[in-house]
Regions:
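Short aromatic-glycine-(Arg/Gly/Cys) micro-motifs in beta-strand/loop hairpins
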Residues: 1-15
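Residues in well-ordered beta-strands of folded domains
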Residues: 6, 21, 44
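A short, exposed loop/beta-hairpin motif centered on an aromatic-Gly-Thr core
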Residues: 15-22
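Short histidine
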Residues: 22-26, 56-57
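A short, charged, amphipathic alpha-helix used as a generic interaction element across diverse proteins
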Residues: 24-38
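Short, mixed-charge low-complexity intrinsically disordered segments
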Residues: 37-57
Length: 57
């Protein structure tokens, strides 16, 4: 399955997209969490938002 992880700045602008190919949504969530750094990450599958992961403070 194909997913998109969008790196989102605090002002809401997308700064990057990472295409993720995984066997299932659980794996996609795990990989998206690993991408979180200073910016939030939104995990999408097509036009469906799966989850938004916020950076730890």
């Amino acid at each position: 399955m194909q997913y998109q992880a969008y790196i989102v700045r605090p002002d809401g602008h997308i700064v990057n997209r990472v295409d993720v190919v995984c066997t299932d949504e659980v794996e996609a969530r795990r990989l998206a969490k690993q991408v979180v750094d200073r910016n939030a990450v939104e995990l999408w599958q097509g036009d469906r938002l799966i989850e938004r992961f916020e950076p730890e403070e």
